Amino acid sequence: SASLVNDAVVAYVSGSGDELLVDVFTADEVSHLSDVRAVVSVGRIMFMLSGVVFFLVLFSGYWVFGVHRLVVLRRLLLYAGVINLVFALLVISGIVFWFDGLFTAFHGLFFADGTWQFSSSSNLILLYPQTFFVDMGTAIMKTFLLGANFFIVLGGVLLALEKKWLE
Protein backbone atom coordinates (compact mmCIF):
# COMPACT_ATOMS: atom_id res chain seq x y z
CA SER A 1 0.00 0.00 0.00
CA ALA A 2 1.01 3.64 -0.37
CA SER A 3 1.36 3.94 3.40
CA LEU A 4 3.92 1.12 3.56
CA VAL A 5 5.85 2.58 0.64
CA ASN A 6 5.83 6.01 2.29
CA ASP A 7 7.05 4.52 5.59
CA ALA A 8 9.91 2.79 3.76
CA VAL A 9 10.84 6.01 1.92
CA VAL A 10 10.76 8.06 5.13
CA ALA A 11 12.92 5.48 6.94
CA TYR A 12 15.42 5.46 4.08
CA VAL A 13 15.57 9.22 3.51
CA SER A 14 15.84 9.95 7.25
CA GLY A 15 18.77 7.56 7.55
CA SER A 16 16.94 4.96 9.66
CA GLY A 17 17.50 2.24 7.10
CA ASP A 18 20.55 1.49 4.97
CA GLU A 19 18.56 0.60 1.90
CA LEU A 20 15.18 1.35 0.40
CA LEU A 21 13.06 -1.65 1.36
CA VAL A 22 10.46 -1.35 -1.40
CA ASP A 23 10.73 -2.22 -5.06
CA VAL A 24 8.29 0.18 -6.70
CA PHE A 25 10.65 2.86 -8.00
CA THR A 26 12.75 3.11 -11.13
CA ALA A 27 16.54 3.31 -10.90
CA ASP A 28 16.34 7.09 -11.50
CA GLU A 29 13.81 7.49 -8.69
CA VAL A 30 15.96 5.43 -6.30
CA SER A 31 18.97 7.53 -7.29
CA HIS A 32 17.04 10.71 -6.51
CA LEU A 33 15.93 9.33 -3.14
CA SER A 34 19.59 8.58 -2.41
CA ASP A 35 20.42 12.21 -3.23
CA VAL A 36 17.54 13.37 -1.01
CA ARG A 37 18.92 11.20 1.79
CA ALA A 38 22.31 12.94 1.46
CA VAL A 39 20.68 16.39 1.50
CA VAL A 40 18.60 15.48 4.57
CA SER A 41 21.72 14.20 6.33
CA VAL A 42 23.68 17.38 5.60
CA GLY A 43 20.65 19.48 6.57
CA ARG A 44 20.38 17.70 9.91
CA ILE A 45 24.08 18.31 10.59
CA MET A 46 23.79 21.99 9.60
CA PHE A 47 20.74 22.40 11.85
CA MET A 48 22.60 20.94 14.83
CA LEU A 49 25.71 23.01 14.11
CA SER A 50 23.65 26.20 13.85
CA GLY A 51 22.11 25.40 17.23
CA VAL A 52 25.55 24.86 18.76
CA VAL A 53 26.86 28.11 17.23
CA PHE A 54 23.78 30.00 18.42
CA PHE A 55 24.24 28.81 22.00
CA LEU A 56 28.00 29.45 21.90
CA VAL A 57 27.36 33.03 20.75
CA LEU A 58 24.59 33.42 23.30
CA PHE A 59 26.63 32.16 26.25
CA SER A 60 29.90 33.78 25.22
CA GLY A 61 28.07 37.08 24.77
CA TYR A 62 26.53 36.62 28.19
CA TRP A 63 29.86 35.95 29.92
CA VAL A 64 32.01 38.42 27.97
CA PHE A 65 29.90 41.53 28.43
CA GLY A 66 29.84 41.70 32.24
CA VAL A 67 27.34 44.27 33.51
CA HIS A 68 25.73 44.49 30.08
CA ARG A 69 24.95 40.76 29.97
CA LEU A 70 21.21 41.14 30.02
CA VAL A 71 21.26 43.77 27.26
CA VAL A 72 23.46 41.56 25.05
CA LEU A 73 21.38 38.46 25.75
CA ARG A 74 18.15 40.32 25.00
CA ARG A 75 19.54 41.73 21.75
CA LEU A 76 20.85 38.35 20.61
CA LEU A 77 17.47 36.74 21.25
CA LEU A 78 15.57 39.55 19.53
CA TYR A 79 17.90 39.57 16.52
CA ALA A 80 17.71 35.78 16.21
CA GLY A 81 13.93 35.96 16.42
CA VAL A 82 13.57 38.75 13.87
CA ILE A 83 16.00 37.12 11.41
CA ASN A 84 14.13 33.80 11.63
CA LEU A 85 10.78 35.56 11.38
CA VAL A 86 11.79 37.43 8.22
CA PHE A 87 13.31 34.27 6.71
CA ALA A 88 10.19 32.21 7.41
CA LEU A 89 7.85 34.90 6.06
CA LEU A 90 9.93 35.20 2.87
CA VAL A 91 9.91 31.44 2.31
CA ILE A 92 6.17 31.17 3.07
CA SER A 93 5.53 34.00 0.59
CA GLY A 94 7.65 32.13 -1.94
CA ILE A 95 5.67 28.94 -1.34
CA VAL A 96 2.34 30.75 -1.72
CA PHE A 97 3.16 33.03 -4.66
CA TRP A 98 6.07 31.38 -6.46
CA PHE A 99 6.12 27.68 -5.57
CA ASP A 100 7.35 26.40 -8.95
CA GLY A 101 10.25 28.85 -9.04
CA LEU A 102 11.20 28.17 -5.42
CA PHE A 103 10.95 24.40 -5.95
CA THR A 104 13.12 24.62 -9.08
CA ALA A 105 15.68 26.88 -7.38
CA PHE A 106 15.88 24.54 -4.38
CA HIS A 107 16.38 21.49 -6.56
CA GLY A 108 18.85 23.32 -8.80
CA LEU A 109 20.89 24.17 -5.72
CA PHE A 110 21.01 20.67 -4.23
CA PHE A 111 20.63 18.23 -7.15
CA ALA A 112 22.36 17.71 -10.48
CA ASP A 113 20.43 18.71 -13.61
CA GLY A 114 18.14 16.00 -14.91
CA THR A 115 18.17 13.95 -11.71
CA TRP A 116 15.09 15.39 -10.03
CA GLN A 117 12.44 15.77 -12.73
CA PHE A 118 10.05 12.89 -13.36
CA SER A 119 6.98 12.24 -15.48
CA SER A 120 3.55 12.75 -13.95
CA SER A 121 3.04 8.96 -14.06
CA SER A 122 6.17 8.32 -11.98
CA ASN A 123 5.53 6.46 -8.73
CA LEU A 124 7.58 9.09 -6.94
CA ILE A 125 5.36 11.90 -8.26
CA LEU A 126 2.18 9.93 -7.59
CA LEU A 127 3.26 9.30 -3.99
CA TYR A 128 4.57 12.85 -3.43
CA PRO A 129 2.59 15.35 -5.54
CA GLN A 130 3.10 19.11 -5.44
CA THR A 131 0.64 19.50 -2.55
CA PHE A 132 2.91 17.31 -0.40
CA PHE A 133 5.81 19.72 -0.90
CA VAL A 134 3.64 22.79 -0.32
CA ASP A 135 2.36 21.28 2.93
CA MET A 136 5.83 20.14 4.02
CA GLY A 137 7.42 23.52 3.29
CA THR A 138 4.63 25.32 5.10
CA ALA A 139 4.96 23.03 8.14
CA ILE A 140 8.72 23.59 8.29
CA MET A 141 8.27 27.35 8.08
CA LYS A 142 5.58 27.28 10.78
CA THR A 143 8.19 25.66 13.01
CA PHE A 144 10.58 28.50 12.15
CA LEU A 145 7.83 30.99 13.03
CA LEU A 146 7.28 29.33 16.41
CA GLY A 147 11.00 29.45 17.13
CA ALA A 148 11.24 33.06 15.99
CA ASN A 149 8.32 34.08 18.17
CA PHE A 150 9.82 32.21 21.12
CA PHE A 151 13.07 34.17 20.79
CA ILE A 152 11.23 37.47 20.35
CA VAL A 153 9.01 36.84 23.40
CA LEU A 154 12.00 35.73 25.48
CA GLY A 155 13.86 38.88 24.42
CA GLY A 156 10.79 40.93 25.38
CA VAL A 157 10.62 39.25 28.78
CA LEU A 158 14.29 40.08 29.34
CA LEU A 159 13.59 43.69 28.33
CA ALA A 160 10.77 43.88 30.89
CA LEU A 161 13.04 42.37 33.56
CA GLU A 162 15.82 44.75 32.61
CA LYS A 163 13.49 47.76 32.96
CA LYS A 164 12.15 46.45 36.28
CA TRP A 165 15.66 45.95 37.67
CA LEU A 166 16.74 49.42 36.55
CA GLU A 167 13.86 51.11 38.41
Where are these regions (language model features)?
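Juxtamembrane non-transmembrane segments of integral membrane proteins
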Residues: S1-A8
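Membrane-proximal extracellular/periplasmic loop immediately following the first transmembrane helix
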Residues: V10-Y12
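Individual transmembrane alpha-helix segments
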Residues: S14-S50, F132-F144
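Hydrophobic alpha-helical elements at and bordering transmembrane segments
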Residues: L33, L73, L77, F106, ...
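Juxtamembrane interface at the cytosolic side of transmembrane helices
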Residues: G51-F97, I152-E167
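Juxtamembrane non-transmembrane "cap" segments at the membrane-aqueous interface
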Residues: V96-S121
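Terminal transmembrane helical module of multi-pass membrane proteins
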Residues: G114-E167
